[in-house]
Amino acid sequence: MFSSRDKAEVKLYFDSNNEENQKILDQCPHLYQKYDKDVTINDRINNIEDSEPTIKNGVTFYPPYYLYNSHFMNYYGSYKIPKLNLKTRREILVNPIDGGTISLDFFELGEFKEDTPTIVINHGLTGGSHERYVQYFAQRAYKEKGFRSVVFNYRGCAGNPITADRAYSAVQLDDIKFVTEYLTKTALPLVKKWFLVGFSLGSAILVNYMADAGKDSPYLAHVSISNPMNMVECTKNLSSTYINNLIYNKGLANNLKRLFRKFDGRLDKYATKEQIMAAQTIADFDDLITSKMFGFETAHDYYLAASSSKSIRNLVKPILFINAIDDPIAPTSGFPWKDFKSNPNTILCVSRWGGHLGFISYEDHMSWSDKAAVEYLSTFLDDNNNNNDNDNKTE
């Protein structure tokens, strides 16, 4: 039924000279477990190849037998798992820089204290707080450790109106900076432990924000899931097969077309409506609109600036990356393996299967990546690394 154990091994890339990484992984059983009595986390493997993992890992990840195909995994994760329809409270914000409208959806999962540790969630390309992957993550974070979760909905997404000429992108950081300042100084000023989690495009925004903010960022730790690490490679992969091009490349381009219809005449300076509607791929659309909107000549130039891969070595706060080798949207080609293994603040976790934002486990048909992410963030809850599940929520 299952493939070999070696294929299923969850591979970890990190700087093992940093004792904090070792302490963190010891507390995350869905990320790391001792492989055997002869290999421990303190025994760094002297790898010849940069793409070889840092340590032999006892953790394996298997999807259900019918989700070994990444396309089935993506479809199941997006459309077949039951909807949660979690209750939210919305706050609408207008960025004073240009009048763009964004929103925050607070998941109302229980009664929270004023200082409850809080996760800010960046959704994917054209998503929002309604997405299954967002809601299941927020629910697990609350049930496991009592986290409060707040979703940052981008311009034009999740019902937000278009009130400015600019949209959003991986390099547009004005909105995440505005949201961060509003949450930490106005909405929830008593919260001391802030966390930032990004999915897909949201993880690219997250990494670019981290690189820009440096140590001034109020977020204690971060998680990036299905990050399109090298966007040039992502574009190649989206066009590499008939299925990838049909389902993802054209599908995501059509999502962008629907979103940008809300801009009406605001896009006339970049392209005609006929040109926009004729775009067949994400690269076509980014060449016409996104690149020009954010000051780049071509989509390729935008991808080089937007890719997380260029920033890994410069990240100065803790972050966990989770990606799958079979991800058709965010392939692992072009990953800066050496940078992950030399930066003491980063941990990269790569599974053989999982697709894009899928990671459905055969054990319980729930997201393995959600479990791993919550475990990782939980290690930062207690200053003495002694977490208490009930400290942060009241029933």
UniProtKB/Swiss-Prot annotation:
Database matches in InterPro entries: AB_hydrolase_1, AB_hydrolase_4_sf, AB_hydrolase_fold, ABHD4
Stretch forming the signal peptide: none
One BP term from GO: medium-chain fatty acid catabolic process
GO cellular component: phagocytic vesicle
Location of the AB hydrolase-1 domain: 117-331
EC identifiers of the protein: 3.1.1.-
Active-site residues (renumbered): 200, 327, 356
GO molecular-function term, one example from the UniProt record: acetylesterase activity
Keywords: Hydrolase
One Pfam family hit: Abhydrolase_1
PANTHER family: ABHYDROLASE DOMAIN-CONTAINING PROTEIN, ALPHA_BETA HYDROLASE 1, ISOFORM A
Record-stated family: Belongs to the AB hydrolase superfamily. AB hydrolase 4 family.
Protein's name according to its UniProt entry: Abhydrolase domain-containing protein
Organism of derivation: Dictyostelium discoideum (Social amoeba)
Gene that encodes the chain: abhd
